[in-house]
């Protein structure tokens, strides 16, 4: 899919859902990036486009959004990392994470968010350090949701990765003795239902 079609899709969905550019861009890119993308100009990289499309509740063919080799390498590393974590191979995951950190633009909130999420998961699952995991998950959430607050969660526009991160955060809170997953689970379900 070329940038003109991606931009048209984003604009169509954003207008249809009555979502402001400001709200869609919050925490992931500038408003001008969305305006340029909607106009069919090169404005956003793969990970930003993926998050924008996700926040609009759309699934996408990730390969079609990729615009360069580095995006593909980072995407492949994310897939390998996820696989190693699912297999509980935390040492291998840590090696892949170091490789990811070396390749990724850590100025990008989306890459930093992913790194902190993985570090949080390893802290939680391998080291059973729920306090460090809580810190990592919270820092990751606030990278794309700078005014993150569970009490105001309904006001935020969340993409798939942010929902996964939020569930990890709340699940870890359970391990710290805070019963928040049940309290905020209905809001998460509403997001999932809206995205279907």
Residue spans of the language-model regions?
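Short alpha-helical DNA-recognition segment
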Residues: 16-36
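A short, Lys/Arg-rich alpha-helix, primarily the initiator
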Residues: 1-16
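DNA major-groove recognition helix of helix-turn-helix/homeodomain DNA-binding modules
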Residues: 47-63
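Helix-turn-helix repeat elements of alpha-solenoid scaffolds
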Residues: 85-99, 126-147, 174-193
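Short, charged recognition helix plus adjacent turn
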Residues: 65-91
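Alpha-helical residues within helix-turn-helix
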Residues: 12, 22-23, 51
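"A position-specific structural signal for the A-helix of alpha-solenoid helical repeats
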Residues: 9, 75, 79-82, 111-122, ...
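Flexible helix-coil transition and linker loops at the boundaries of alpha-helical arrays
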Residues: 66, 101-111, 126, 142-158, ...
């Amino acid at each position: 899919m070329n940038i003109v079609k991606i931009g048209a899709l984003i604009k169509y969905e954003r207008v249809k859902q009555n979502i402001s550019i400001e709200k869609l861009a919050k925490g992931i890119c500038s408003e001008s990036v969305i305006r340029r993308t909607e106009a069919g100009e090169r404005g956003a990289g793969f990970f930003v486009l993926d998050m924008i499309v996700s926040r609009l509740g759309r699934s996408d063919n990730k390969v079609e959004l990729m615009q360069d080799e580095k995006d593909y390498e980072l995407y492949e590393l994310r897939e390998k990392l996820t696989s190693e974590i699912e297999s509980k191979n935390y040492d291998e995951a840590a090696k892949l994470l170091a490789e990811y950190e070396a390749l990724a633009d850590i100025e990008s909130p989306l890459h930093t968010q992913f790194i902190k999420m993985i570090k949080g998961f390893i802290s939680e699952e391998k080291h059973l350090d729920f306090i460090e995991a809580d810190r990592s998950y919270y820092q990751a959430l606030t990278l794309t949701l700078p005014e993150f607050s569970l009490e105001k969660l309904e006001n935020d526009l969340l993409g798939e990765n942010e929902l996964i991160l939020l569930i990890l955060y709340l699940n870890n809170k359970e391990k710290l003795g805070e019963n928040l997953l049940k309290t905020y689970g209905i809001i998460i379900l509403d997001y999932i239902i809206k995205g279907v």
